[in-house]
Design a protein with these regions (language model features):
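Switch II (G3) loop of P-loop NTPases
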Residues: 63-66, 92-103, 110-128, 132-160
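G-domain G4 guanine-recognition motif of GTPases
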Residues: 8, 65, 95-99, 146-148, ...
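Primarily NTPase-proximal linker/entry elements flanking Walker-type ATP/GTP-binding cores
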Residues: 1-89, 96-99, 110-111, 115-117, ...
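Short, glycine/polar-rich helix-capping loops at beta-to-alpha or helix-loop-helix junctions
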Residues: 103-106, 213
Length: 229
């Protein structure tokens, strides 16, 4: 069953070793018990990030490959804190650092308009710090959308890293990936985006796949936590 759900062989071995160590022979013959125990252990390996607003303003930056749903996720996070939709409203602002994708600016500006929150663009190196400072300390949360970068496009990743130079500030950076990404690509993506010192991972498009063993296996192997689903 774990193979059918695309768990890695090393992850499966870890679970099997745990079964042999912690369950009796009689226990191993009880399928329902074994299944419950395996599910519990899988749950224990999934690390959940502790999301707290540590500073004011708290700057949240989403990075990741093209087409993973960063802009939509930015809107969802903004709505979570938005005075209209939240039980604990905060003052939220958006920054857009995606000036490459056609329609990207219009899309995020539409979200900002629907949520009635301010938005500004990061157009060149140095803009990031200036725009964050322009919002001032009366802002609680600043969420930054960025251009999608293939994990193999080292030049574009380097450009985005310069564009997001925070001059000593410590934004919360989240790597955004889809649940449908194959395991080998996940490992490469996790590695190539380390340049951003991301805090944890946001997983998107869970509703578009029936198997997430690859995701659980890779995140466990690389010791990465999940911030949002």
């Amino acid at each position: 069953l774990m193979e059918d759900n695309e768990f890695s062989q090393s992850y499966i071995k870890k679970i099997l070793d745990k079964l042999k160590k912690e369950l009796t022979i009689d226990d191993l013959e009880d399928f329902d018990l074994v299944q419950k125990q395996v599910v519990d252990w899988i749950g224990e390996t999934i690390k959940i990030a502790d999301i707290k607003l540590k500073t004011r303003p708290q700057v949240i930056v989403l990075v990741g490959p093209t087409g993973v749903g960063k802009t939509t996720t930015v809107a969802k996070i903004a709505a979570r804190y938005n005075p209209i939709a939240s039980d604990h409203p905060l003052r939220v602002c958006l920054l857009n650092a995606d000036n490459y994708r056609i329609g990207a600016k219009d899309q995020i500006e539409t979200y900002a308009s629907l949520l009635s929150i301010p938005i500004a663009s990061i157009d060149k190196d140095g803009d990031f710090v200036n725009k964050v400072n322009s919002y001032g300390t009366d802002t609680d949360v600043i969420i930054v959308d960025t251009l999608g970068c293939s994990h193999k496009d080292y030049e574009k990743i380097a450009v985005l890293r310069r564009r997001l130079d925070s001059k000593g500030a410590m934004p919360e950076v989240y790597l955004t990936m889809t649940a449908m990404t194959k395991a080998s690509d996940m490992k490469e993506i996790l590695q190539q985006f380390e340049i951003f010192s991301y805090n944890s991972v946001i997983v998107t498009k869970l509703d578009e796949t029936g198997c997430i063993g690859n995701l659980i296996s890779v995140l466990d192997e690389k010791n990465k936590s999940i911030a949002y689903l």
